[in-house]
A protein has these predicted regions:
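Active-site and NAD+-binding cores of ADP-ribose-processing enzymes
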Residues: 2-17, 25-27, 53-146
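Short secondary-structure capping/turn segments at boundaries of alpha-helices and beta-strands
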Residues: 19-21, 47-49
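Extended catalytic/binding region for NAD+/ADP-ribose chemistry, centered on the ART fold
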Residues: 26-48, 118-123
Length: 146
């Protein structure tokens, strides 16, 4: 299994989740958001970056792990307003983290719900089977944030 992440940090420790809440978790929980393609990783970063904060370059992390039967959250299982009601997705993701039943959870992107992202549970026993195998530095294309 190959997953992708754009980050300033080359680790899968989920420290950022301790400091800030995200779409699928409340603050105080270690979690890493991953994408199934490099393009969807870039889309998520662009959505969360203002045009004034566009970095001159970014690092794309290629993450490999075992092929797993990964549980998924379907948009059909979510209320119609899930994209605007953060408590719905945060409750679901935080509950998943606390149960610690799987290392990954596939979730729909709030930007393009037909695209799936993966939540990575660093505390799960299988987390050690995932590793960053490549870090690729790219210049950031300014056309994204015009």
């Amino acid at each position: 299994m190959v997953l992708w992440r754009i980050s300033r940090h080359r680790d899968l420790g989920g420290i950022g989740g301790l400091k800030a809440a995200g779409r699928w978790h409340y603050v105080g929980h270690r979690i890493v958001y991953l994408a199934e393609t490099p393009a969807s990783a870039l889309l998520e970063v662009c959505d969360h970056t203002s045009s004034n904060d566009v970095p001159p370059k970014f690092t794309l992390l290629k993450i490999e792990g075992p092929d797993l039967d990964t549980p998924s959250v379907s948009t059909h299982a979510l209320p119609d307003n899930w994209r605007t009601q953060l408590d719905v997705t945060r409750d679901l993701g935080t509950d998943w983290l606390e149960k610690n039943e799987s290392v990954l959870l596939r979730v729909p992107s709030a930007i393009v719900p037909e695209t799936m992202n993966c939540l990575f549970n660093w505390a799960h026993r299988q987390a050690a089977e995932f590793r960053i195998v490549e870090a690729i530095a790219y210049p950031f294309d300014a056309r994204f944030k015009k």
